[in-house]
């Protein structure tokens, strides 16, 4: 079986779902392929909390996701419920709730076709390239055992391991290069001082965190 679309996204991780929704917003037909039966990546498979403390920086599709999570707990258990409080304004959730919310977001995008149980094995023989670009990939339907071909103008690798990129011959390395190789003096350092808006329920204390990590005071100007 061969199927065509403007965009094929490999991996229904949060990044893959966001990419699919963004492409659909621009009027592109999208096929979203997921290896497992449960789209949503880590949040839908056990990682029930986000570690974003600087919630004033959150926007876009992720902000919509947190608001839908919050609405679920408020409508299901009530505005004064412990469940709503424990959801930390939508930043903490049960994996099943995360999956339901993400699938609901996909259902709102008719140009996106989600296909689960589609396995891409990271091998050059499972794709076709033309002028250095992928034009076709082949995946296994894990339910039927059939091999399916997907053609698209653009392919997006949203797997956690970079399976599609590796199969296409994109250079990669294991580990991390030195900061001098690309002139990145800040690489590998985590700067904890945040002077923007704090999210409700966040445990982040910018001054104390700065003192602990740097044994100094943050700038106040």
Question: What are these language model-derived features?
Answer:
Residues 10-13, 33-36, 46-47, 118-119, ...:
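Active-site-proximal beta-strand/loop segments in catalytic clefts of secreted hydrolases
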Residues 6, 27-30, 153:
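Residues that mark the start of a beta-strand
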Residues 16:
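N-terminal Rossmann-fold NAD(P) dinucleotide-binding loop
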